C-alpha cells in the first residue's frame, strides 16, 4: 500500500519511482548479495491466504505488509537474495496508490495515483520501464498560465518564471539556514547545561533572531524555568521550525504581486499536496526533479506488471504485528502468519490511524515520527472530451489556472474557509491531452482536495466513477475552468459527462491521503520512520519502508518507495546473515565442548 496521488511536474515535483537498476543509487546502498542462501521460496497458492485459525503451513523469512511499490520491490529483492516472502495486501489488487483507471470511449489508461517519472535522466525507474517495454512520453512544462480566467501573455509568463526561479533559489539556501539555526540551538543548549544565566543566553539569541518571529522563544525565555532537557528540545524545535517554513521564501517584490497566488499553489498544494505554510522548505529543496515523462499504459500498469508472480494474499488487511517472540506473527482477520521478520510498507496515513497494532508498542521516537509526519491530499477530476478543445496546446501539457468560482462553489469555499485569491478565485492545475488523448485532468491540492473529497465521506470509499451527489462541486469548478481556458462557451457539449472519474485518496482506507508531507521542522522524521525495531532479544525483527521513509531527494515519491523497499530487503538479509552466522558459531562451539 504505497505511493500516492501525484506530485505534479513543477520545478520541485513528485512522482513515484524506484531504484532497481540505477547505479547512481545502487552505489549508495550496501550490497548484501554476498553470502546468498540457497533457500527456495515455498510453493504458493490461494490456500496460503484462506486458511482459518492459526496459520502454520510455512514460516517465511519475511512477512511483507502492503503490495505497493515498496513492498513489491522488497519482495523481488529478497527472493533474489534467496529469502522466502509472503505479502499481505488489504486491497483486492496490487500496486497501492499506483493504480490505473480507464477513461472515455477509448478506455485510455490514466493513473489515479502518481503518473510521472520525474527527473528522467537520473530516475532509477527510467531504465526499468524501458526494459519492460513501456513507452514514455515527455510532459510539456513550458506551461500556459491563466490569471483571473485569461491566458497570461509572454511578459506575464516571464515574470512568473522569474519569481519561481527566485523562490527555488531561496528554498535551496533554506537547508543551510536550518543547519545554522540548529547550530545556534545546540550552542544555547550547551550554555544552559553549563549554568550560564538564562537571561544572558536569551539576550544572545535575541541579537541573532528577533523574538517577534519566534514566539516560542519569547515564552521560553520569559516563562517558567525549564529543565535542561525541556529548554534544549524547545529551543532546537523553535529555531528549526521557523527557518523551515517554505512560505517564508516566496519573493515579495511588487512586480510579482499578480502571480504570487499561482506560485504559492504551484509550490505548495499542487506539488507537496499541502499548503505552502505547512510544508518543509528543506524537504522541498532536496527533492530531485527535472524532465518528466508519462508512461503509455500508466505507472499503475507498470507496477502491476512488476509484481507479477509474487506471493500476495489479497483482501488481507493486517490488524496486528507481534514481534515479541523469536520471530513475528502477523494477523489478518482470523488468520495468523508466521515469519522471522516483518516489513511494514503501509502509508503514513494508515500508521497514523492506528489500523495496525504493534506488540510490543513501537518505540517512542517511532511513534513521534508517525505523529509528526502528515498525509497530503490531491484530487484529480479526469474529464474525457468529445473533441480537442485545446488545438493550440501540445500533448501532455501542464497548465496552471486561476479563475472565478461558480456561485455554489464560492459559497461552499467561504463556508469552509478554503484558500481564495481576492476572495473569489481558485488555483488549479491541469494536464491537457495526456497521452495525446482528448482528455483533461484537473487537480485540486491540499485543503481544497481534502475538503472536496470529504464531501463523499460515507458515499464513496476510493477513486472511480464520479458521484453526482458529492463530486458535483469538483466537477462544476473543473468544467468552469475548462470553459475559460479553452474559450468554449458550450463546454458541456464537449464533455463526456458520464465518463468523468474522480480520485478520493483521503477516503481510501489503504492510504488515507495522497502521499506523505513533512511539515516545517520535521523532514528528519522520515529517517526515524525508516529505522528498524529490535525485538526483546535484541535482534532487529520489524522493518519499515515506503515513500514516507524515503531519503530527502525522493521524499514522498515512487523512487523513494522503490529504493526504501530495496534498502529494507538488504537490511533484512544482512541481519539474517549475521544471526545465522552467530547460530553456526554457537553450534561449532557446542560441538567443540562436547
Where are these regions (language model features)?
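FAD-dinucleotide binding site
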Residues: 8-17, 24-594
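N-terminal secretory signal peptides that target proteins for export/translocation
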Residues: 1-6
Amino acid at each position: 500500500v504505497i505511493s500516492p496521488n501525484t506530485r505534479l511536474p513543477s520545478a520541485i515535483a513528485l512522482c513515484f519511482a524506484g531504484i532497481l537498476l540505477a547505479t547512481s543509487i545502487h552505489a549508495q546502498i550496501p550490497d548484501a548479495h554476498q553470502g546468498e542462501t540457497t533457500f527456495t521460496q515455498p510453493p504458493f497458492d490461494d490456500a496460503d491466504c484462506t486458511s482459518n485459525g492459526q496459520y502454520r503451513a510455512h514460516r517465511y523469512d519475511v512477512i511483507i505488509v502492503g503490495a505497493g511499490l515498496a513492498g513489491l520491490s522488497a519482495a523481488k529483492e529478497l527472493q533474489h537474495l534467496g529469502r522466502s516472502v509472503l505479502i499481505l495486501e488489504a486491497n483486492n489488487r496490487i500496486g497501492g496508490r499506483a493504480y490505473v483507471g480507464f477513461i472515455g470511449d477509448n478506455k485510455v489508461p490514466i493513473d489515479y495515483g502518481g503518473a510521472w517519472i520525474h527527473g528522467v535522466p537520473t530516475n532509477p525507474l527510467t531504465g526499468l520501464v524501458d526494459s519492460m517495454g513501456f513507452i514514455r512520453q515527455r510532459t510539456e512544462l513550458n506551461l500556459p498560465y491563466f490569471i483571473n480566467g485569461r491566458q497570461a501573455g509572454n511578459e506575464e509568463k516571464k515574470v512568473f518564471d522569474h519569481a519561481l526561479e527566485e523562490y527555488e533559489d531561496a528554498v535551496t539556501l533554506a537547508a543551510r539556514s536550518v543547519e545554522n539555526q540548529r547550530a545556534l540551538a545546540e550552542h544555547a543548549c550547551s550554555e544552559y547545561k553549563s549554568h550560564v544565566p538564562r537571561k544572558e543566553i536569551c539576550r544572545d539569541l535575541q541579537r541573532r533572531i528577533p523574538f517577534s518571529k519566534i514566539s516560542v522563544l519569547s515564552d521560553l525565555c520569559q516563562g517558567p524555568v525549564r529543565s535542561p532537557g525541556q529548554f534544549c528540545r524547545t529551543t532546537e524545535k523553535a529555531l528549526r521550525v521557523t527557518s523551515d517554513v517554505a512560505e517564508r521564501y516566496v519573493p515579495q517584490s511588487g512586480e510579482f504581486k499578480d502571480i504570487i497566488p499561482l506560485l504559492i499553489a504551484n509550490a505548495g498544494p499542487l506539488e507537496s499536496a499541502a499548503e505552502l505554510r505547512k510544508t518543509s522548505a528543506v524537504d522541498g529543496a532536496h527533492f530531485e526533479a527535472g524532465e518528466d515523462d508519462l508512461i503509455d499504459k500508466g505507472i499503475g500498469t507498470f507496477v502491476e506488471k512488476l509484481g507479477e508472480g509474487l506471493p500476495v494474499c489479497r483482501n488481507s488487511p493486517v490488524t496486528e504485528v507481534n514481534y515479541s517472540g523469536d520471530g513475528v506473527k502477523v494477523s489478518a482477520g482470523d488468520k495468523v502468519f508466521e515469519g522471522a521478520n516483518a516489513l511494514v510498507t503501509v502509508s503514513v496515513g494508515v500508521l497514523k490511524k492506528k489500523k495496525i497494532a504493534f506488540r510490543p508498542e513501537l518505540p517512542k521516537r517511532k511513534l513521534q515520527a508517525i505523529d509528526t509526519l502528515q498525509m497530503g491530499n490531491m484530487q484529480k477530476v479526469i474529464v474525457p472530451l468529445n473533441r480537442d478543445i485545446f488545438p493550440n496546446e501540445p500533448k501532455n501539457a501542464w497548465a496552471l489556472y486561476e479563475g472565478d468560482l461558480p456561485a455554489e462553489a464560492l459559497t461552499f469555499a467561504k463556508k469552509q474557509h478554503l484558500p481564495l485569491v481576492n476572495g473569489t478565485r481558485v488555483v488549479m492545475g491541469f494536464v491537457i491531452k495526456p497521452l495525446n488523448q482528448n482528455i483533461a485532468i484537473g487537480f485540486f491540492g491540499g485543503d481544497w482536495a481534502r475538503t472536496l473529497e470529504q464531501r463523499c465521506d460515507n458515499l464513496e470509499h476510493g477513486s472511480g466513477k464520479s458521484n453526482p451527489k458529492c463530486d458535483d462541486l469538483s466537477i462544476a469548478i473543473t468544467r468552469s475552468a475548462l470553459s475559460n481556458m479553452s474559450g468554449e462557451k458550450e463546454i458541456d457539449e464537449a464533455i463526456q459527462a458520464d465518463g468523468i472519474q474522480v480520485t478520493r485518496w483521503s477516503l481510501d482506507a489503504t492510504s488515507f491521503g495522497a502521499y506523505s508531507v513533512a511539515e516545517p521542522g520535521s523532514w528528519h522524521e522520515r529517517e526515524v520512520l525508516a529505522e528498524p525495531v529490535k525485538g526483546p532479544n535484541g535482534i532487529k525483527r520489524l522493518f519499515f519502508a515506503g515513500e514516507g521513509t524515503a531519503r530527502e531527494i525522493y521524499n514522498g515519491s515512487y523512487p523513494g518507495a522503490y529504493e526504501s523497499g530495496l534498502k529494507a530487503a538488504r537490511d533484512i538479509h544482512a541481519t539474517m546473515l549475521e544471526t545465522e552466522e552467530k547460530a553456526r558459531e554457537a553450534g561449532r562451539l557446542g560441538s567443540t565442548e562436547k
